[in-house]
Design a protein with these regions (language model features):
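A hydrophobic alpha-helical transmembrane-helix feature that marks the membrane cores
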Residues: 1-244
């Protein structure tokens, strides 16, 4: 069975549904839109709060970091049927993080949010067309390569975070606006975009194989993870380019 590059979406999640209890493309799309709506709403709330009350806004920001990480990690271990609860919780907490982060970027580089949102969804729909046209075909080798790349990127993120917290040092160049920093962001965005191909394949196979309907929430959660990741990386790339 093929595995998705997204650590949350893989064929091991499949069960079998019956009749109206089966997973559908429309169901996944609707639930993904709902999660995005929740995220956008809480992002607006946190962004507005931090401009009026910076202290409370900062508390919401760190609460969002802790809550979204806890929700994302718990999704690996819990019964997938609980995704109907964990998904919206994750989206709400993630919005608390994205609001202040996006607001800070917008303060430094006016118009950057609109650019980042446009590029994120533009990339999403481009990869959907690429997938439907089978220009890039999902394969076991692609899944393994993406999983390895995502693992390496996560290790770099973790090492960078630990160094920033525990020492005055950081991993050189990757956060800067030089060639290496911009190149790193482009690589991360490319990996994230290719992850969509495997995610779409997971969802399509789930529908074809009659996966249970509760996996619509799980699939929507997986897509949400990728969309948020891409948005943040595109925002960072645009900031690097505009700071040159």
């Amino acid at each position: 069975m093929m595995r998705s590059g997204n650590p949350y979406l893989n064929d091991d999640s499949f069960g079998f549904g019956t009749g109206q209890n089966r997973m559908t493309l429309e169901g996944v799309a609707n639930k993904t839109m709902l999660l995005l709506g929740i995220c956008i709403f809480t992002a607006f709330v946190s962004w507005t709060t931090i401009t009026v009350n910076p202290g409370l806004g900062t508390i919401l920001f760190f609460l969002g970091i802790i809550g979204s990480l806890a929700a994302a990690i718990s999704m690996w271990f819990i019964d997938k049927r609980l995704a109907v609860y964990i998904g919206p919780i994750y989206a709400a907490f993630e919005g608390l993080v994205l609001g202040p982060f996006s607001g800070l970027m917008e303060a430094y580089y006016p118009g950057i949010i609109v650019q980042a949102v446009g590029l994120t969804f533009g990339l999403f729909f481009t990869m959907l067309v690429v997938y439907r046209a089978r220009i890039i075909k999902p394969s076991k080798n692609l899944a393994i390569g993406l999983a390895s790349a995502i693992g390496a990127i996560m290790l770099i993120y973790m090492a960078s975070f630990i160094l920033a917290i525990a020492s005055p040092y950081q991993i050189p160049y990757i956060h800067g606006n030089g060639i290496v920093g911009i190149g790193f962001s482009l690589i991360v965005i490319a990996v994230g975009a290719l992850t969509f191909v495997m995610d779409f394949d997971f969802i399509e196979k789930g529908v074809e194989q009659g996966a249970p309907k509760h996996l619509e929430w799980y699939a929507a959660f997986g897509l949400m993870i990728t969309l948020v990741w891409l948005y943040i990386e595109i925002l960072r790339l645009l900031a690097k380019l505009r700071s040159r």
